[in-house]
Amino acid sequence: MEERVCAEAELVPQGHGLMGESRPNEASGALQGIRVLALEASVSGPHCTRILADMGAEVIKVEKPGSGDLIRAWDSVVKGLSSGYVWLNGNKRSFAIDMKKPAGLEVMRRLADRSDVLLENFAPGVADRLGLGATELCARNPRLIYCSVSGYGQDGPYRDVKAYDLLIQGEAGIIATTGYPDRPAKVGVPITDLASSMYAAVGILLALYQRERTGRGQVIDISMFESALAWLGYFPHHYWHQGEEPERVGMRHHYIVPYGPYMAGDGVYVSLAVATPHDWDVFCRNVAQRSEWLQDARFRTAPDRRKNRGVLEESVEKLFLEQPHDEWMRRLRDAELPHGRLNGIGEVLAHPQAIARKMIREIESPVGKVPIMGSPLRLSESPVRFDAIPSLGQDTDPILRELGYSAAEIDHLRRDQII
């Protein structure tokens, strides 16, 4: 079975150095000295390796000569660069090579021999056809951690079904929980790409930790579909035990009422969450100033409020139209109830908490310094790094020299259009 390939491979001497050795151009970080070979494109793979790169790993991003990662062509809004590429590829080294040619394949195998981790998010079977599958590479390098991210996983009846975030959201039930009663909606960010990328990062870190004990790598198989299933939360339990399909309730909560954004009299939305009996009491007395709701049998308990959601929601909506948003914010703040605003992106980027926590950073790029969103990871002894966004293939020659290629050999690879 492939999941045992790395663990069962015979340990052999490595010809190109030790895993975890110090390498050039690394900032201090929790993963300093870890080399990740990234055969990645689009979102799920690059987001995983950005997490690793932010924490100090040396990520070598393999790209197609001339065009690079397909996400480079999505738009050109960042002074000519793609917003998606800028988002996902800071702190990485760009290595441009044609893996389909024999000489390019040999370079890739030598790189894998000297890597701690290989991440690929090709369709299942593509890496094997290229000669870069787990069986072969783990036999050469038994310490290699080989992580595959795909739509549905490396086996099963949907293995070869093409996958995009929207399609997986639908197949995995995310869309069944999202939207309004008369129409479904997808989550606005690519949630299944992000979920699978985070599970991949966790899996890689776990495998690195286990390798410290065993000396051996292993194969990791992550799917967007299963990552989305794992994030369905309590909905499967309601179906298993009550036969209950989730309602689509828009920006409301399925089981807590009132909960969500309500338009105030000046057209600004105010979000609130009334989740406990205490909060319901405080909300009725001090915020809504409708003590009679506490005596209404339709609203006494959380199940009662859920059962009579329509009546209660309509009452709260009408109430909020009576005052401007700042009055509701004041009442909620004074009552110490959970609340917030619905901010646009411009407001988010100027949010005082984001500014205070330095979540907006600048990073070098081929077009000069550009703003990026920082990392939510905050480790007291392992700072996140903010180095640079690479131009296509900028690190190809240095990486080849590190592998022992001479200037003449590099020129030959370039003449043959391998790099």
Question: What spans do the regions from the language model cover?
Answer:
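Flexible glycine/proline-enriched surface loops and loop-helix/loop-strand junctions
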Residues: 183-192, 263-268, 382
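Short Gly/Pro-enriched turn/cap motifs at secondary-structure boundaries
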Residues: 85, 249-254, 260-261, 272, ...
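Conserved Rossmann-fold dehydrogenase catalytic segment
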Residues: 154, 181-191, 212-228, 244-254, ...
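A glycine-rich dinucleotide-binding beta-alpha-beta segment and adjacent secondary-structure elements
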Residues: 334-386
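Aromatic-enriched alpha-helical interface/lid elements that frame and gate functional surfaces
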Residues: 258-335, 339
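Oxidoreductase and adenylate-handling cofactor-binding alpha/beta cores
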Residues: 197-217, 230-242, 284-290
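N-terminal helix-loop segment corresponding to the beta1-alpha1 unit
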Residues: 2-213, 391, 397-419
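Glycine-rich beta-alpha junction loops
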Residues: 66, 152-153, 224-229, 266-268, ...
